[in-house]
Amino acid sequence: MAMVDSKEKKLDFAQIAAIAIKNTHSSVPDRMAMPAILTEVTQPNTDVKQMGNTVFILHKGKNGQGFFKALNADKARNFVENSKQYVVYAKKMGMNMLVTEFDDPAISTLFHAISKKPPMPGMGFKEYKLKSGGRRIVLNLGK
């Protein structure tokens, strides 16, 4: 499915999730993905925030640490800006370190783009390749 420029049209959660499901390379069948997402967003200590046509799901842990994922239906340039806004939001919530995992290596490009001009001082990330072929990002939100 085509991405939708949030500067031209704002989508709702269901529309964003549907587009993200179609465009994500996942082992979960499409018909099972939406119920899984709906279950995930209702878990305790979970924060859901929409920035543009990107929905960020954060599972808050202890000591300012959390695991997050993004459901994106926005254009690439907006996805970068939405992500910058989100990490500032997460920092204001008291988060210090966020972790995410994904299978599509193109997503790591997003983190490299943000690291060139981070929205907060001291912000950085480390990328790890997983045995499964996926990747893990550990994002330090800085000062």
Predicted regions: what is each one?
Residues 27, 55-56, 106-109:
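Short, surface-exposed beta-strand/loop "edge" segments at domain boundaries and coil↔beta transitions
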Residues 42-75, 142-143:
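Conserved donor-binding loop and adjoining core beta-sheet/short helix segment
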Residues 61-122:
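Acyl-donor binding region in acyl/amide transferases
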Residues 1-36, 143:
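Short amphipathic alpha-helix that is part of the acyltransferase structural core
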Residues 117-138:
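Conserved catalytic-core motifs of GNAT/GCN5-like acyltransferases
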Residues 8, 53, 63-64, 123, ...:
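Intrinsic-disorder/low-complexity loop/linker signature
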Residues 2-15, 47-50, 95-114, 130-132:
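A structural boundary/capping signal
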